Every structure is written in structure tokens, then in C-alpha cells.
Amino acid sequence: MINFKFGENNVKLDCEKITFFEKLDEKKKVIVHGVDEEIILNATLRDIEEKLGKNFYKCHKNFLVNIKNIADVDAENRIIKMNNNDQCIVGERHLNKLLRILNEA
């Protein structure tokens, strides 16, 4: 579990149920894509990344993925397919490191 405190609000999230975080166009807004639900947080990816462990990887400026929920990586098209069939983009400079991390897991 991870706890986020934003002003008066506390949000508890089960890290294992999170597939990825996605930055929205609005400043300091992030969608948490979960196995069961999606919620919007008033935070930055950097704020979230600092609270998470090694099971999450920032694969693109707009995405922070849960490595345990990755089903497949299409290296040619730089697409991550998650266990729930959602997809994320992998930044070109992040692809090789992500593949190394997955091979070690």
C-alpha cells in the first residue's frame, strides 16, 4: 500500500493493483490506471515516483509503469502491453533499460 496526502485528502493505493500512472495535460494531474478502477490524483509523476519502489519504472515522460503488470513489450513500435490489455508508450531512450529490467525480473 502507498499513501498519498494532498492537502486535507489521504489516498491509499494498493501498488499491486496499479498497472500504470499517466500524466494528464493539466498541470499536476495524473491518472492512476488500476486493475479495477481509474482515479485522478493532484500530483506530478515525480511526486509519485519518489514514493514508489523498484517495481515501477518511468518509461516515458508521461508514463510510470508497474513492471509486475507488464504482459509484453513491442520493442519495434515501442509499446508496452499491460496484463489488462492497456497500452503505454516507451520512450526511445528508456527502451533498452526497460528490457534489461524485465530480463532480470
What are these regions (language model features)?
Residues 77-98:
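C-terminal structural segments of small proteins and small subunits
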Residues 46-49, 95, 99:
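Generic solvent-exposed, charged/amphipathic alpha-helical segments
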Residues 1-83:
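Conserved binding/recognition cores within well-folded domains
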Residues 1-3, 96, 101-105:
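Inter-domain helical "communication" segments and dimerization helices
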Residues 35, 65, 87-90, 102:
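Flexible domain-boundary/linker segments
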